[in-house]
Amino acid sequence: MAFNFNWSPLTADAEFYQRAQEMLTAALNKSPKPPIIKDDILVNELNLGSVPPDLEILEIGDLAEDRFRGIFKMCYSGDAFLTLKTRVQANPLNNHLFSKPSFTSPQPLAADAGLTIPLQITLSDIKLSAFIIVVFSKSKGLTLVFRNDPLESLKVSSTFDSIPFIKDYLQKEIEQQLRTLMMDELPAIIHRLSLRLWCPEYRAKEDQEMAEAAKKTKDEVAVDPFASPPQDAVDARGNVLDATEISNLSLDGGSEIHSLFSQKNLLRLAALTNSHRTLSLFTPSIRDAVFRAWAPSERGDSAGTTTPATPSLQRPQSSLGSQSTTYTFSNRSSDDGHGGIPSRPSLVNMNSATTGLSLGANRGSRSHPTRKKKNRVVNLRKPKTTESSESGESETASTTAVSEPTVPSRIPEEPEDLPVTPPSGKVRFNSIDLGDSPKKLPPSRSMTPEQVKMDQIPSLTVQPSTPINTQEQKRPAYNQSASTSYTPEKSAITPPHTPFSYPHGLHFSTTESPSGILEQAWIMKMASELARRQHDDKTARQGFWSTSSNGDDAPPAYEPKAL
């Protein structure tokens, strides 16, 4: 069985080509276009060529005088060609800016605006191979369905063939768009064309619809842009127009109609044009804003160095009788009348700060960071020839000689039955030896930091009724054999002691006379006695729990009762 297809009427009918071009144009602009194409795609020329496709009959399902249904294998490699026109983006960066987040792209103005140029594309050497299902009826036209992708290859020629990158990009994009067009849009186009060719009723109906659309377009009232003119309209010379002059204008008026724009918009358009021409970022000014570059320099350029001043630390303490007293130890200045602040914190300052005592410098004295400090140490212990005691005494005195105190702020506390005497040999403290010292260090009892915080100094007035020398003579002398000396191992580690809070009004000063040293020794003795009485009163008030914590007799252990 053979079939004869007449291909010449399709190639010779001009009306058919015109209608086919309109349908192809609508189909190409219907689908989403790539971002590089900035205008509509127009089918400029369509030619089916003189070579018809080759059809191989695989199956015939229905055959009658006015209908036909069958499956064919189609192969086409003719001389048909198609020419398209559009406008594309000349900036190659624009394609990448749309596919990436905005914060990752610099978005330069010259590249983001871009330049659109015309593009002409010619599709030729089209090769098709597919299995198609053909259903023909005079009343319903021709229906053609592709069972697979028909496009094998085609040749794409454009105005950018000299640039390999653009040529390859256009080849890939057009092939992808053409495959979608043949699978989805081409069967519908062929069906409508067949209805127009074989069905006169459909042709008359389609002509009537086209005439109505043209009439509607012709009768459409144009929108007058001057119905609501801008508020600050100006003419070509920049003169502001009033309402009467604007009302006299019309769409077909004088030659100055094109210049009737808002003055603000003209300034913005001019700034935008300048930014494209000069690559200016055109940063607008911000009202009521202070930029950092405008602010004066806040760096203080001072000549010389500033001595760091240590603030005086003071801590008020109140007794049980709701009495508030502040105790302050202050350093005395040197012989030249100018005090000095140590450049770094000493061990005594650290210990005093943690226990609440205040070691501040002279308020009102000047600071001399380059002057060497003079340290003075008061030796209050009895001379002794034992070298072990010398090592223990030097450990205590060296910590006191750092911050230039007149009286050691930390008094070592010892049991009453173990008096300690200082060495009789020469001990070098980098200070002035102030003569003889008292025979015995006043006894004191150790106190915990918690007891110092809770207990306050009671209001006790001590007045010496006899001279200090008489009291010193009445003291019993201890035997040298009864004294206990420290070993070098014990003297290397200073046990933690709590400094005493001396009564209000006591002031220590360094003098070179023996009477001043004895007076200081008597004051220290009285302070130790006050601390001992305070500790005894505290121990008596605490009761059972304090006794058990101090190591007294513990309650008897549990013993089961004998049956």
Swiss-Prot record:
InterPro entries, per the entry: Mdm34, SMP_LBD
**Keyword set includes Zinc:** no
Stored PROSITE patterns: SMP
Q: Does the keyword Nucleus apply?
A: no
A GO molecular function held by the record: lipid binding
- Report the membrane topology from the UniProt record: Multi-pass membrane protein
Which spans does this entry mark as compositional bias, Basic residues?
Answer: 365-383
Protein origin, superkingdom: Eukaryota
Subcellular location(s) of the protein:
Mitochondrion outer membrane
Q: Name one GO biological process term.
A: mitochondrion-endoplasmic reticulum membrane tethering
Here the segments flagged for biased composition (Polar residues) are 303-332, 346-357, 458-471, 478-488
Q: Where in this protein does the record put region Disordered?
A: 298-499, 531-563
Q: Where is the SMP-LTD domain?
A: 1-195
What's this protein's function?
A: Component of the ERMES/MDM complex, which serves as a molecular tether to connect the endoplasmic reticulum (ER) and mitochondria. Components of this complex are involved in the control of mitochondrial shape and protein biogenesis, and function in nonvesicular lipid trafficking between the ER and mitochondria. MDM34 is required for the interaction of the ER-resident membrane protein MMM1 and the outer mitochondrial membrane-resident beta-barrel protein MDM10.
Subunit structure, per the record?
Component of the ER-mitochondria encounter structure (ERMES) or MDM complex, composed of MMM1, MDM10, MDM12 and MDM34.
What's the domain remark here?
A: Lacks alpha-helical transmembrane segments, suggesting that it resides in the membrane via beta-sheet conformations similar to those predicted for other outer membrane proteins and porin.
Query: What is the protein name given in its UniProt record?
Result: Mitochondrial distribution and morphology protein 34
Q: Which organism is it from?
A: Botryotinia fuckeliana (strain B05.10) (Noble rot fungus)
